[in-house]
Design a protein with these regions (language model features):
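Surface loop/turn motifs at the tips and blade-to-blade linkers of beta-strand repeat domains
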Residues: 151-156, 194-195, 207-208, 272-275, ...
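Flexible coil segments in periplasmic/lumen-exposed cytochrome c-class electron-transfer proteins
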Residues: 37-42, 46-51, 97-155, 241-245, ...
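Electrostatic cytochrome c docking/interface patches
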Residues: 30-47, 287, 346
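Asp-box/WD-like beta-propeller blade repeats and closely related beta-sheet repeat scaffolds
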Residues: 241-292
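Gly/Gly-Pro-rich "capping" loops immediately C-terminal to redox-active cysteine motifs
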Residues: 42-46, 57-88, 190-201, 311, ...
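Beta-propeller domain segments
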Residues: 127-142, 202-207, 211-213, 221-223, ...
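Conserved beta-strand position repeated across blades of beta-propeller domains
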Residues: 153, 163-164, 217, 292, ...
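Extracytoplasmic electron-transfer domains, predominantly the class I c-type cytochrome c fold
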Residues: 59, 63-65, 69-120, 213
Length: 521
């Protein structure tokens, strides 16, 4: 967090009074959008330690003359916007100044994000990759269904990404640095499929490799044709100017399809690949890598902000990254794609401005494409993806940069910038829980959840249920809290819900099983 650093006694008094009164004087008022860029040299953590820790403790827990900012309710609201507006407008009757007269709007929002992060136990920089999984004991009673959670498959690689469930209830699982694994329905036997595109392992830092296996997904008519699609990061060395200049491997997303015979990958066909000149030397962490089918014979796939700085190229329609693409099932280009005929654009592009897409699904009720996406510090999103839509990165985000500054990269290069040209999320998640994959539940095992979004998270280790009415959220429930890093989610043959859980000491597949327990109204 960047705040204005002033050494005057008056400023110190005002800053202390702000924290003393925050817990009892938050007011709920609408706030304007924040656009002005700012760059100050002092992070929030440093400023807090300098100005406030003596009163409120290093962990915001409170001290002799300062009330705690965590661990208790705030009288006038807990949400990010309520906290931000309270800071900006103040509460003069209680002696709290209007900080909009002292701090920039970006600084105020950054301060609010920091406070809410701490209150929600989602501090910046904590990703819970080593935190043990916590399976609930006994029955979980949610708002509409009771269920239990049980492990089905254990001992998977630490870097799993995707799973598909076959008609015979076997599992296909991608392990980023190892490849494609076939697992029996009872989880007792598994086989690595031979002959798939190669997955690369970085011995020095497995979590920052180049050349990962990403999504596995079954053709809509898999039962008849056996086609399986693989979305992976195609690696090359000494293959373009950037790779040669830095003497590093480069990669870019690629989609193929094939079939499995025994333990062999056969009949491979390339669906789409990009010119080697576009391959990037950054880690595959930002690769995106999700895939979805609609009901009209189209394949969608996502590519995240793959440039080393995660900013450049995302808005450039001549480059593949930072985009969601749409092709026919055989890789040909649909004639109604939004940029067909535009010589300055790739004709596979469906939408742009994507930072780190984590989930991609088609809503069966509307055939609309939906996506989940990571923001920077805050600004995780659940979006409806419109053809030709611009989803903002790096021009705009409801989150903030990791430094605390506003997200506004590249605006000064535009002739003009209008917020109304940016597609806004259906649901914004700030602070960031690190949203992951999701489904629109269609099974019969949990009938009261039908058509709801079931969404995993990584950092916050939660499983969400979100009810949607058309294009708006009407209910949000955390089904599992402090549980595990949920990397993928799928519905099985009988409507049971399977979760792919990621952990550094070995990933797992777990299953939600409905229980006949009466739920109180």
């Amino acid at each position: 967090m960047h705040c204005v650093s002033q050494d005057s006694t008056e400023f110190r008094k005002l800053f202390i009074s702000f924290f003393v009164l925050l817990s009892v004087s938050l007011i709920s008022v609408g706030t304007g959008k924040l656009y002005a860029a700012e760059n100050s040299g002092l992070t929030f953590e440093a400023l807090y330690e300098q100005q406030c820790a003596v009163c409120h403790g290093n962990e915001l827990q409170g001290e002799a003359i300062g009330v705690p900012l965590v661990g208790s309710d705030l009288l006038h609201g807990q949400s990010l916007e309520e906290v931000a507006v309270s800071i900006a407008e103040g509460y003069p009757d209680a002696g709290m100044p209007a900080w909009s007269e002292t701090l920039t709007t970006t600084q105020i929002r950054t301060l609010a994000v920091f406070i809410v992060e701490q209150r929600d136990s989602m501090p910046y920089g904590e990703f819970n990759v080593r935190t043990p999984m916590q399976f609930p004991e006994g029955v979980v009673a949610s708002n509409k269904h009771a269920f239990t959670v049980e492990p089905v498959v254990e001992g998977l690689d630490q870097l799993t990404f995707s799973m598909a469930i076959l008609p015979d209830r076997q599992f296909l699982v991608t392990e980023k640095t190892r490849g494609l694994r076939l697992i029996s329905a009872d989880g007792q036997q598994s086989t690595m499929i031979q002959g798939t595109p190669k997955a690369y392992h970085n011995e020095e830092n497995p979590r920052a490799g180049v050349g990962w296996m990403l999504e596995v997904i079954l053709h809509p008519d898999y039962a008849d044709n056996g086609w399986i699609y693989l979305h992976f990061s195609d690696r090359c060395e000494d293959c373009n100017t950037m790779s040669r200049q830095f003497n590093r491997a480069a990669s870019m997303n690629k989609v193929v399809r094939g079939r499995i015979e025994g333990d062999q990958w056969v009949d491979q066909e390339t669906i789409i690949e990009f010119d080697k000149a576009s391959y990037q030397i950054g880690s595959d962490i930002g690769a995106g890598g999700r895939t979805a089918f609609d009901s009209e014979g189209h394949l969608f796939f996502s590519i995240g902000a793959r440039s080393p700085n995660t900013m450049s190229g995302v808005q450039d329609l001549a480059l593949p990254w930072g985009k969601i693409h749409r092709v026919n099932l055989d890789g040909s280009i649909p004639e109604d794609n939004p940029y067909v005929g535009d010589d300055s654009a790739l004709d596979s592009i469906w939408s742009r401005g994507h930072r780190s897409p984590q989930g991609l699904e088609v809503n069966p009720l509307s055939d609309e494409l939906w996506s989940t996406e990571h923001g920077p510090r805050g600004g995780d999103e659940l979006n409806i993806i419109e053809p030709g839509g611009n989803y903002g990165w790096p021009l705009h985000s409801l989150g903030i940069n990791y430094s605390g500054s506003e997200v506004n990269y590249g605006r000064d290069e535009l002739e003009f910038f209008r917020l109304e040209d940016i597609e806004m999320p259906i649901v914004d998640f700030t602070p960031s829980p690190a949203v992951s994959s999701f489904i629109f539940y269609q099974g019969d095992a949990f009938p009261e959840w039908k058509n709801d979004v079931l969404m995993g998270t990584l950092k916050s280790r939660e499983l969400f249920r979100i009810s949607i009415d058309g294009r708006r959220e009407i209910e949000q429930e955390i089904l599992l809290d402090d549980f595990a890093r949920v990397r993928d989610i799928e519905s099985g043959v009988d409507g049971e819900i399977f979760l792919l859980l990621e952990h550094i000491e070995g990933s797992q597949i777990a299953r939600l099983i409905p229980e006949s327990v009466e739920i109180a109204e």
